[in-house]
Amino acid sequence: MLCGRPRSSSDNRNFLRERAGLSSAAVQTRIGNSAASRRSPAARPPVPAPPALPRGRPGTEGSTSLSAPAVLVVAVAVVVVVVSAVAWAMANYIHVPPGSPEVPKLNVTVQDQEEHRCREGALSLLQHLRPHWDPQEVTLQLFTDGITNKLIGCYVGNTMEDVVLVRIYGNKTELLVDRDEEVKSFRVLQAHGCAPQLYCTFNNGLCYEFIQGEALDPKHVCNPAIFRLIARQLAKIHAIHAHNGWIPKSNLWLKMGKYFSLIPTGFADEDINKRFLSDIPSSQILQEEMTWMKEILSNLGSPVVLCHNDLLCKNIIYNEKQGDVQFIDYEYSGYNYLAYDIGNHFNEFAGVSDVDYSLYPDRELQSQWLRAYLEAYKEFKGFGTEVTEKEVEILFIQVNQFALASHFFWGLWALIQAKYSTIEFDFLGYAIVRFNQYFKMKPEVTALKVPE
């Protein structure tokens, strides 16, 4: 039985006053020993029912016949509803380019609870993907950074020149991630040279190519030589045309609403529940903040593009020899506001395990980053490369205000993970940190005004 209780209105007011009084000092919290790659587009919005049918003409109560005008009105209403639903679906549909290779689906389930069962499942996949490999010589390496899924590297020999990555989906992550959309995004990005090869999917995961290089951490993303590569690669993804002629629409608010509907109301463990009730905003406050964000941020004028949506440091692979970067993990990719993707990346300068928001990029670094991004984005879109100070200023304001939505989104995500995930990580603590930072930075960034 859950120990949760609803907060009173006075509790809510006290909570907001407390948040408004947070210190501007760096927030630095030890979360856990795990780090990095985490985090389904929301369900389609419900199709509204057509208008109630008139119950007959005056003086003919109980009759079910309709006049010709009434029939016409009903027919038009139904057509409008259907057309609206189709338009919404197409505006969120990720179009895989013709000629893209199909991805095989293997009827294999990889058990990850016991090491020998995990190896059996991985070897079953390798029989299809690397039939020339001797099973006795295959080495399995567990990557421990992930806090959504389990990731295993499979290779033979002493060097990791040819590595097959086996990703096993985390418990209940189907609540958070639309796996079909993930595969579409993977294929689109692969077709444009922005993703490794996707070898196959299987019953509870997928296999893909290992990218040679170094997974970055917060100290790397502040390096101008590296962050300019990151800005250019993100601009390349944002410039991809994957909407087949329809004007794309962001699914941010729908996905956020879905996450909100899934957050727990309490925890069975008494100590965890006390922490949850004292440090997490009430559902009423969260609902009010979501309404406010949608009204304000949707009107900032940020373009909707194909976004990565989870560009934390460990999802960026830097190859010093080749002088380039590649992004990995496309679970949360999809159409979103351009400024959200950048703001989310800036939030990730603080890290995941040891969160330190004093590492959030200052205005000077952001200005350099955003200028490099705009130059590359215009180049990829065929608009030239000249960037004005006003363009940089507008994007700066949009990015920092959308950073609020990023904090809120991952706060909701972490609450759901705290309920379901079997990975060793303090998800509740992470949710607390993200919501605290949301309320801390809200007054400062909302005071920024887009120039006329």
Swiss-Prot record:
- Keyword Nucleotide-binding in annotation: yes
Q: Give the Gene Ontology MF terms in alphabetical order.
A: ATP binding; ethanolamine kinase activity
Output compositional bias ranges, type Pro residues: 43-53
Which InterPro entries does the record cross-reference, listed alphabetically? Kinase-like_dom_sf
Write down the EC number: 2.7.1.82
Pathway(s) where this gene product acts: Phospholipid metabolism; phosphatidylethanolamine biosynthesis; phosphatidylethanolamine from ethanolamine: step 1/3
Give one Pfam family, short name only. Choline_kinase
Asked if the Swiss-Prot or TrEMBL record annotates the protein with the keyword Lipid metabolism, the reply is yes
Q: GO annotations under biological process?
A: phosphatidylethanolamine biosynthetic process
Q: Which UniProt keywords apply?
A: ATP-binding, Cytoplasm, Kinase, Lipid biosynthesis, Lipid metabolism, Nucleotide-binding, Phospholipid biosynthesis, Phospholipid metabolism, Transferase
Q: In which tissues is it expressed?
A: Expressed in kidney, liver, placenta, heart, leukocyte, ovary and testis.
The record's GO CC annotations read:
cytoplasm; cytosol; membrane
Could you name the domain of life of the organism this protein comes from?
Answer: Eukaryota
Catalytic activity as recorded in UniProt: ethanolamine + ATP = phosphoethanolamine + ADP + H(+)
Give the location in the cell: Cytoplasm
- Region (Disordered), start-end ranges: 26-64
Q: Which PANTHER family match?
A: CHOLINE/ETHANOALAMINE KINASE, ETHANOLAMINE KINASE 1
Q: Name the family.
A: Belongs to the choline/ethanolamine kinase family.
Described function: Highly specific for ethanolamine phosphorylation. May be a rate-controlling step in phosphatidylethanolamine biosynthesis.
In its UniProt entry, what is this protein called? Ethanolamine kinase 1
Q: Which organism is it from?
A: Homo sapiens (Human)
**Where is the organism placed in the taxonomic lineage, from the top?**
Eukaryota, Metazoa, Chordata, Craniata, Vertebrata
